[in-house]
Amino acid sequence: MSPMRIDDGLTQKMILEMLFPDPNGLVCVGKSAFEFHTARLNQFKDLSQCQFIVAAYMTKPKGITQDGKESMHCLDNCGERRYFVCDFDEPKSADHPAIIMQLKRTFDLVMVLSSGGKSLHAWFNVQPDEEESFWQSAIEYGADPALMRNRSSFVRLPFGKRDNGKTQQVFYFDYTKLKD
């Protein structure tokens, strides 16, 4: 049961403003891995057709990629992780909720949403001294290690729309576990 009722009008905008409350903070949002934009959250007019977000504030509008090209989405312009996101492709999807609840026993679970496919994305508020322990546990349970290696990785946008047309539904949201 989600601490905040999803069916009582919780919207994408409300969730994003709680996840990223700094009005001057830059966020990177994408319609695809190749079509994205970095701006202040309030500058985005309609994110309903987007499917991705970086779970960290961006430090500047553009950075330099490892290939030496300018980009709005790269490690050079990505700040520290704000949230740690697990994507479970394995084991089977029926086991994902139990795995997430097991991690929730130790780490602060903020949000769970559908990938719009077969997996769930679980957003955690992890303290700096817990980072290594968190990833060790998450990967042991089947989380994709790619999200651990790259803090600028795209994750699924709450209530976004995947390229297959499915909404990335939020199932759980606990505003008491948000970052300050």
Predicted regions and their residues:
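DNA replication initiation on ssDNA origins
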Residues: 1-83, 155, 159-161, 178
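Long, low-complexity interaction regions most often at the N-terminus
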Residues: 3, 107, 132-136
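Short, glycine- and small/hydrophobic-rich beta-strand elements in well-ordered beta-sheets
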Residues: 4, 105-114
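DNA replication initiation modules
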Residues: 8, 60, 65-100, 126-180
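Short aromatic/hydrophobic-glycine micro-motifs
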Residues: 25, 108-109, 143
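Short glycine-enriched loop/turn motifs at secondary-structure junctions
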Residues: 79-80, 116-118
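Short beta-strand
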Residues: 110-117, 146-150
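A generic structural motif
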Residues: 118-124
